[in-house]
């Protein structure tokens, strides 16, 4: 699986066991990503932070 880094078009190949791409954004500024990368379990969103997870190459 390949996931985008914080600044596309840079990306990285995920290590074994981390099979989700994720994007973390602040709810007040949803268009500005704070973090991107590979993750094993999609975290729960909170009042301030929203997580978007997906399973396709470079989908974050």
Curated annotation (Swiss-Prot):
Transmembrane segments: none annotated. This is Naniproin. Gene3D superfamilies: CD59. Keywords: Cardiotoxin, Cytolysis, Disulfide bond, Hemolysis, Membrane, Secreted, Target cell membrane, Target membrane, Toxin. InterPro entries: Cytotoxin_Cobra (IPR003572), Snake_3FTx (IPR003571), Snake_toxin-like_sf (IPR045860), Snake_toxin_con_site (IPR018354), Toxin_cobra-type (IPR054131). It is found in: Secreted; Target cell membrane. PROSITE patterns: SNAKE_TOXIN. GO terms for biological process: killing of cells of another organism. The lineage of its organism: Eukaryota, Metazoa, Chordata, Craniata, Vertebrata. The keyword Ribonucleoprotein does not apply. Expressed by the venom gland.
